């Protein structure tokens, strides 16, 4: 009983920290976008506009949240929860340091892939429940996009699993004490980051909510707290993808050999996640949005064959090295 209560307390604290980190990430993104676009960005609320995300949160919470006419009320309300909850659950198995994971399970990689794949159900459910043609088109795009990118997302990780010999995130980090897997799996790391951006519906892969042709896609009819949950889920998904990339390819909480002992593991982990997240922001600020057919063609005709080739080559090398 005491153990369950302690787990509940730690889980609540982790969720609160994630909410603050996600809010801070929105501020960082807006400041970076302002710098890239040669403007100031948020600079009024708090020092350097840091409290802008707090003001935005209050604004979202105080807005009316009412389903549109003809919408399925139950599905409309449940959809944002279905989209955000798996992302929060995914952080439960992320190892922020040696022994610093809410749940250290042996199949952490599979669990995270499953949680990332579940988010699309919330998007599709919200699109179908909104009773809007723009939302419906956005939901269909999200489903087709996830089918294409989820395939090589999983394949890009199998090379790491082969080298580490484990599906446990902690064991994978321990296997990188001598060399980070990004040096052994550069193609796998690149493919994973591409698929991760697509799974989080971020530019240039935000076709499900493309403002140019779908108003706001599956978010068209959402306001208030429901919109806020979708928004929160998207930014947490970016941080989850960055955390998984750091864990699998960049040594997790392990620092470089010549600097590792001078900083605690969680600090190294946070710094690496921050760098990956900044790269995702840079991608959003600089790359154009492709056409939908180009997006799907890239997934099935370029990325998937490359992921299969990388997996085959890794398998051959692992077998050759293990042969007597």
UniProtKB/Swiss-Prot annotation:
Pfam families: NADHdh (PF00146). This is NADH-quinone oxidoreductase subunit H 2. The chain crosses the membrane at residues 1-21, 77-97, 109-129, 147-167, 179-199, 214-234, 238-258, 263-283, 298-318. It is a multi-pass membrane protein. InterPro entries: NADH_UbQ_OxRdtase_su1/FPO, NADH_UbQ_OxRdtase_su1_CS. Belongs to the complex I subunit 1 family. The keyword Cell inner membrane applies. HAMAP family: NDH1_NuoH.
């Amino acid at each position: 009983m005491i153990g369950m209560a302690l787990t509940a307390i730690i889980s609540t604290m982790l969720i609160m920290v994630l909410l603050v980190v996600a809010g801070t990430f929105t501020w960082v993104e807006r400041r970076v976008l302002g710098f890239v676009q040669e403007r100031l960005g948020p600079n009024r609320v708090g020092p350097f506009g840091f409290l802008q995300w707090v003001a935005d949160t209050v604004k979202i919470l105080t807005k009316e949240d009412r389903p549109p006419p003809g919408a399925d009320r139950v599905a409309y309300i449940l959809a944002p929860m279905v989209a955000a909850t798996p992302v929060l659950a995914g952080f439960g198995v992320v190892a922020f340091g040696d022994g610093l994971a809410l749940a250290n399970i042996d199949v952490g990689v599979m669990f995270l892939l499953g949680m990332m794949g579940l988010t699309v159900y919330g998007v599709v459910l919200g699109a179908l429940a909104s009773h809007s043609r723009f939302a419906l088109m956005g939901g269909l795009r999200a489903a087709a996009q996830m089918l294409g990118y989820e395939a090589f997302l999983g394949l890009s990780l199998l090379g790491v699993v082969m080298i580490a010999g484990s599906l446990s995130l902690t064991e994978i980090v321990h296997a990188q004490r001598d060399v980070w897997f990004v040096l052994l799996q550069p193609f796998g790391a690149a493919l994973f980051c591409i698929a991760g951006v697509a799974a989080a519906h971020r530019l240039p892969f935000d076709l499900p909510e493309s403002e140019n042709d779908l108003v706001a896609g599956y978010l068209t009819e959402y306001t208030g707290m429901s919109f806020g949950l979708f928004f929160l889920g998207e930014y947490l998904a970016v941080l989850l993808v960055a955390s998984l990339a750091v864990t699998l390819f960049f040594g997790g909480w392990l620092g470089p050999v010549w600097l590792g002992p001078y900083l605690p593991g969680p600090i190294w982990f946070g710094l690496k996640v921050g760098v990956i997240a900044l790269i995702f922001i840079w991608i959003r600020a600089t790359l154009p949005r492709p056409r939908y057919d180009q997006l799907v063609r890239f997934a099935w005709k370029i990325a998937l064959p490359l992921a299969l080739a990388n997996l085959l080559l890794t398998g051959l090398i692992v077998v050759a090295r293990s042969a007597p």
